[in-house]
Amino acid sequence: MLLETRHLSKVYDNKQAVNDLNLQIETGSFTAILGPNGAGKSTTIQMLTGLLQPTAGEILYDNPIKLGVVFQNSVLDDMLTVQENLEIRAGQYKDIDKGKVDSLVNQLGLQNFSTQLYGTLSGGQKRRVDIARALLNSPDILFLDEPTTGLDIQTRKAIWELIHQLQIKEKMTVILTTHYLDEADDADMIYIVDHGQVIAKGSANRIKEQYAQNFLKVFVTDTADLKEILKEEIPFEEVRVNELLIHPETTEK
């Protein structure tokens, strides 16, 4: 086991951000932590990478290992070129091969904009550079905290294809957070979290088979008119006051 957490918890000002989290990460695996905004995903990443101290629980690594992290917000300098940013970061590590920056520039397709200022790049280009920066020290685990946030669908797909290929070719251990199930499709293990707790886990296929449902939850101030419209057309149930769960039989309507 490369990484394991036991009963990991984090409390901020009496608010439980992460609650009794148990993860098991195998060497060379692709693990996705999936959940909505505020579920505790970023807090978990920050604890796993040593940026936050847990309130309780343990984080166990198999021997000292090197970590690479792609944060939601970039840590690179907008006023430096891509090449300059990467060379400065490379200089902060010991024993990095002199050709490492050039190798990553080629591997991640940064050649066409390596001399541009980082601040002038598109969102997708910045993400590629951010990933290159995280790979400078040849990490044993690459952490990606919602790396496609704010990107359009085509750019999202390109970034995830890049990450997937890196994971396969380099046999890299990858841990990512996302709120898109499709981005976790290639994961060996998915942990679905909500309010800081794991509520489901398994492969993408198992998660979809066991938990995916075709329904729409609707919140309204008064359900009377909506129920009148729906009763002849679409099955529904009233789960709480002013809250309906609609079960469409098809997505074509």
Q: What kind of region is each of these model predictions?
A:
Residues 87, 98-113:
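Conserved ABC ATPase "signature" region
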Residues 117-121:
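Conserved ABC ATPase signature
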Residues 138:
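Conserved catalytic motifs of ABC-family nucleotide-binding domains
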Residues 162-245:
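ABC transporter nucleotide-binding domain
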Residues 49:
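Helix-to-loop junction immediately C-terminal to a conserved catalytic motif
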Residues 142-145:
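Catalytic Walker B motif of ABC-type/P-loop ATPase nucleotide-binding domains
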